[in-house]
Amino acid sequence: MANTLYDRTIAFAGICQAVALVQQVAKDGHCDKDAFEASLSAILNTNPANTVGVFGREANLKLGLECLVKGIDSTPAGSDITRYIISLMALERKLSSRNDSMSQLGDRIQTAERQTEHFDLFDEQMISNLASIYLDVVSPIGPRIQVSGTPAVLQQTSSQHKVRALLLSGIRSAVLWRQVGGKRRHLIFGRKKMIEQAQILLARM
């Protein structure tokens, strides 16, 4: 995969989309269906031809690109998104430094891939399976990501499964970010360029 601004923008939009969906689910119990399906599909797409191939096509990242362009404002919702992104990227760094966990993650994702021969990926059973991968493999590495939302919604098992499956998708995009050469300095000094790239992509949708 190429280490270009385009590739980094796609990978970072993948992280943004996952956390924007986490926020939607935590607040309302449901979220943008197309974006949700694209983000979950990305988890199992482990051998793509190129970076955008992880998500199928650029249009599948519309929500993530919009989230990237809008930027992270100082509202409580914006602060939550920032916190989720920082937490996911820190978690991925810890995960990638542990070969045992990375190998376990790879095995569990392959198992989930085989399960899609019998279940639809967006079936409650499959969402629960993806959630358990996050809970068993990623979450113990810590620190835990505290999700803010509507308490009654967050108490529902289906919402918890969706949130964890989406956090796993965020980890998938954070791995991709690292694979295409994404570094912390790109977020600090190259954010403006990524926003411009995202605007170009949105304009052609």
UniProtKB/Swiss-Prot annotation:
Disulfide bonds: none annotated. InterPro entries: HflD, HflD-like_sf. It holds the Pfam family DUF489. One of its GO terms (cellular component) is plasma membrane. It is a peripheral membrane protein. Keywords: Cell inner membrane, Cell membrane, Cytoplasm, Membrane. SUPFAM superfamilies: YcfC-like (SSF101322). It comes from the Bacteria. Its main location: cytoplasm. It is found in: Cytoplasm; Cell inner membrane. PANTHER family: HIGH FREQUENCY LYSOGENIZATION PROTEIN HFLD. HAMAP family: HflD_protein. Belongs to the HflD family. This is High frequency lysogenization protein HflD homolog. It comes from Vibrio atlanticus (strain LGP32). The lineage of its organism: Bacteria, Pseudomonadati, Pseudomonadota, Gammaproteobacteria, Vibrionales. The gene is hflD.
